[in-house]
Amino acid sequence: MKKENRGKLKIIPLGGLEQIGMNITAFEYEDSIIVVDCGLAFPEDDMLGIDLVIPDVTYLKDNISKVKGFVITHGHEDHIGALPYVLKEINLPIYTTKLTMGIIENKLKEHNLLRTIKRKVVRHGQSINLGQFRIEFIKTNHSIQDASALAIYSPAGTVVHTGDFKVDYTPVFGDAGV
């Protein structure tokens, strides 16, 4: 049986490796890029005078015509904290769950970005299509409600991005009530 070449999926970490915080990963397939999370990091002790560390998004700016939007796993600062700063440079839509979107909207309001950024609330079990990608939001347990893992489908295959999660034998699930 001949194996079909379905192209290559690039997974490009722009932060969050070998450090705590600043989680941001680009997934690229041909003419489409999606960005999962956009967090900040807090400065190390030797970084005097620095309040926040935000990711270098030069790759996204250089490929802006391919970038379809931000897909956010949950509302912790290391996953959403850099959004207002990055969105001032690259205006892209945000896709996430209801509680997480509420937290993000408060940040956008603080930075006078609420009216300029497109946003879409996605439910667990629902999928969205962005360019060459289909992204399914999967309910996961974490220390914040409404957290998601993501099944990212592309012509090259499927990647499951877990975001953050915790094993909890007595999880609190249900509607976030936002």
Where are the language model's segments positioned?
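His/Asp/Glu-rich metal-coordinating catalytic cores
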Residues: K2-V71, H76-V178
